[in-house]
C-alpha cells in the first residue's frame, strides 16, 4: 500500500535494472556475483559501475595524472572483460560503465539516471570506514533504492 502523495515507488512490476559497484576488491567481486545471480533470476539488466578515485596527489608531479589515468583504464578494462565473460555465460543483458570521481557520487548518479531498482556493493575492507562511514552506509542513507551489502 502506498500512502497518498508518496513518490517512493519508482519502478515497474518487477525490477528492470540491478546496479553493482565494482572496484576489483574481493568483496566487490562477491557483490558482482550476487548481483548477476539476482539479475538472472529477475530477468533484468545488470549494470556494473567501476569508479576510479581521484587522488589528492594527482597534480604532485608531471605525468602523475596520466599514469593514474592509464592505470585506471587498464583496471577498468580487465574488470569489464571479466564481467562481460561472466554475463555472457549467464545470458545476461549487461552494461559496463567506467568513470573517475567519488564512488558515492558516481554510483548515486548512475542509479538515479538509469532508475536502478537496487544497488549492490561489497562491504568495505577498510577499518577506517567504521569511523567515517562506508560507501554502503552512505548509499543506504541516500534512501532512494534498496541497497544490498555483500560481505
Residue positions per predicted region:
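Structural beta-alpha unit
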Residues: 1-14, 85-119, 126
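Small/aliphatic-rich secondary-structure junction motif
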Residues: 7-63, 88, 142
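Short glycine/serine/threonine/alanine-rich loop segments
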Residues: 42-45, 92, 116, 145
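General small-molecule cofactor/ligand-binding pocket signal
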Residues: 47-49, 95-99, 148
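Short, hinge-like loop/turn segments at secondary-structure boundaries
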Residues: 63-67, 113-115, 137-138
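A short acidic, glycine-rich active-site loop
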Residues: 65-78
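Glycine-rich, Arg-bearing micro-motifs that act as flexible, cationic patches
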Residues: 118-142
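Short, acidic/small-residue loops that bind anionic groups at enzyme active sites
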Residues: 142-151
Amino acid at each position: 500500500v502506498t500512502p497518498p502523495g508518496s513518490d517512493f515507488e519508482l519502478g515497474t512490476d518487477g525490477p528492470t535494472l540491478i546496479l553493482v559497484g565494482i572496484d576489483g576488491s574481493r568483496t566487490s567481486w562477491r557483490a558482482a556475483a550476487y548481483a548477476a545471480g539476482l539479475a538472472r533470476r529477475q530477468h533484468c539488466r545488470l549494470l556494473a559501475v567501476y569508479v576510479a578515485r581521484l587522488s589528492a596527489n594527482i597534480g604532485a608531479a608531471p605525468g602523475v595524472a596520466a599514469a593514474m589515468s592509464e592505470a585506471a583504464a587498464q583496471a577498468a578494462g580487465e574488470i569489464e572483460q571479466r564481467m562481460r565473460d561472466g554475463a555472457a555465460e549467464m545470458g545476461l543483458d549487461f552494461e559496463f560503465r567506467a568513470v573517475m570521481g567519488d564512488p558515492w557520487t558516481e554510483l548515486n548518479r548512475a542509479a538515479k539516471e538509469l532508475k536502478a531498482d537496487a544497488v549492490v556493493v561489497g562491504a568495505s575492507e577498510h577499518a577506517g570506514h567504521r569511523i567515517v562511514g562506508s560507501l554502503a552506509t552512505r548509499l543506504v542513507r541516500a534512501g532512494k533504492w534498496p541497497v544490498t551489502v555483500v560481505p
